[in-house]
């Protein structure tokens, strides 16, 4: 289907550095029998572009929509529990190899959570509107921490809301992304995984923790997309290993690229 053939979207420096791509069916990954042999690709290698890194990440979760106080309340609690565990787990420990200069990557913490019910969401929302909401909430809602070099806002969308970003949309082009606002505010957006390409055969919570871990690790190592650790051909630390998962504790997370081990770990 068309919604399963789109892997990445691109803009001026490549939105692939921001997004979790859709999972492609195996049949679409296999070249035709009569296809010419592909040239050997050079192995991935992330290089540091001298931009900021998030050394001790402070995650604040925002759940947008009244559903998160009713039908999705239990899921919101589970997502917060995921961050409480994962931010001091071996998943974060393995990112230490990407420390650079004064940025020594270590454990983080979740600093809080809130549910946003206004403005009310319609059937789609743009990244511009998400940025506006976030900036407004930072300015007017005392529940939100002020942005710092370590602050990372994770924004979760309710079922039935399409997110539009970079000329593409959730469930037709991507499953999540991270971005920055003027290099000062770091955030990640998690659309509700309402399609097979964004669940990858996983249970709902597992799909969300997998994509959340993808964007978490990319935000830490490349908070301003393309200015931290990046590979021109393959994107960010999570892009190289998209939809390869493992368990950390009881949670499903995505494998991440290791320069030292030259593989997804």
Residue ranges and their predicted role:
Residues 55-59, 148-153, 183-186:
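Loop/turn elements at helix/coil->beta-strand transitions in domains of secreted/extracellular proteins
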Residues 50-52, 63-67, 157-161, 191-194:
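Short, flexible loop/turn elements at secondary-structure junctions
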